[in-house]
Amino acid sequence: MGTETFNRMYKYRISGDKYVLSLDNHVEISAALAAFCRDLDIRCGAVYGIGAINEATFRFLDPATKKYVDKTFAEQMEITNLTGNISRKDEAVYLHLHITASRRDYTCVGGHMLTAHVNGACELVVERFSCEAGRRFDPETGLNLYDF
């Protein structure tokens, strides 16, 4: 296993092409993960994780209108699953993240994760792929799809 490394938003360890991350409390997950990918020049990869959040905005794509409907949740929730991929769009880090979070009453909410603020812990695994994947806008779907 590699050396533990520290940053302003995260700590991590390296194991081959995989990175085990612990995000700092109160950081925004997308911002911290994007900073990590920029810092380590990860251009293509996968991410999954768990944790706890207290404010998050999720998105749902309405395929009829090709518009996202955003909803913000301002409550303590457990991340039961965070899954996504890492690529680049116009040379910038592009994260495509989906999340499911459990509420205090054990119901779950989820969708495309726009933002989520750590409140407790957030533990992620990032796998770096040796290929590169870009993104391009697809007018038919209204999505930024892989561009190989």
Language-model region placement:
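N-terminal intrinsically disordered, cationic/polar leader segments
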Residues: 2-95, 100-148
